[in-house]
Amino acid sequence: MSVGLKTRLLFASAVAALIAVACVGGGGGDGDGEDTSEDRLTFDDLGLDDRIPLYTESWNTDWTKRTISLSELIAGIQRPDPRDVIPPIDDPQFDTVEEAAQWLVDREPVVALELEGEARAYPLRILTSHEVVNDVVGDRSVVVSYCPLCNSAVTFDRELDGQVLRFGVSGLLRNSDLVMWDRQTESLWQQITGEAIVGELAGTELEFIPSPIIAWEDFRAQFPDGKVLSRDQGIFPPELYDNQPYAGYDSSTQPFLFRGTTDDRYPAMERVVAVRIDGAGKAYPFSVISEERAVNDEVAGTPILVVFGADDTASVLDTGDVKTGRGVGVGLAFERTVGGRVLTFDALGEDRFVDRETETVWDLFGNAMEGPLAGEELTPVVNTNELWFAWAAFNADAPVYTGSSTTSTVGY
């Protein structure tokens, strides 16, 4: 059985959604549902696959407004209306750290969000079956999203011009990446970029909020009073989340539901730290930074530090049980300016780093542990640990770090 078919069958059993590929043709359409004018553009006029109107005929999406060719979209779920067949979480329930420790294992990955004085963890074992969580943290309305096919965990502010949007899973994909939809305008949004690509809000971009993937044991140590997305959401039985639907996916050589040519500079399924600052981006392949451990660089004029560690952090895309997923590590990125001074970092043993200017020792999460700057924290920059093919598909012209940093490893 191929990895793709295995993935499809497992996912069907997990979320009752049979994946079926349907490529769409190019052009725009009129989504008002009326058929009173001979001049009205129909799906047939636009050359779209005849299955697409079946899937979307009840939508109020304005197909005439778009920033992409509709030929780039794939219908991923075979239902008359595929929206939210993969159910988003709209009223998230949380466990305490102590409660979550009863069912999470130390090395499994979580999305870590620290905002408005609160810290929350969203285990990937849950996000693989929901992909979208509409949440409120402090006074901020956010959407925490995860696309398993791209391993992209991205959090956005979902308030736009005074209106709070509520997001769901459209059932469509582009470059294998989740396409979200909002229920207020029925616009379609690219998960990996936060841009509305079709509909009333086409061209609008959501604000990124840093939310790295880290190991559960590290979240627990950093935020003992944090909250953890519960297994008991009233949607699926809690034990369902023990079985992961994407077993073997990131060991394959090609992405699933990807229509195009992958960039062969790196293996398609290699993870990269994807840094985004002020509209600029740069990728740092795990195969490179896992050797250097600390990279001093600059993106969009901002001096940054990219670090690699927690090597045993499990992949949620490797086996059916995240407890046995192979270790892939995590990559994180921070601004490296503290108190107006740009620091230069070297790796110092496992998950520790030292700056040359003050010889302060820092941990993997940007906390100064020992030395003159003890107690200081580095400011995170927006970064994800997505798969190379996805980064390259959306950022073909962006630079890629290839090594030869000024960093050295001290005692590593």
Predicted feature residues:
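C-terminal motif of bacterial Sec signal peptides marking the signal peptidase cleavage site
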Residues: 19-22
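Short, conserved catalytic or interaction motifs in soluble domains
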Residues: 25
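Mid-to-C-terminal functional-domain signal that highlights helix-capping/loop sites
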Residues: 28-412
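Bacterial N-terminal signal peptides that target proteins for export
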Residues: 2-11
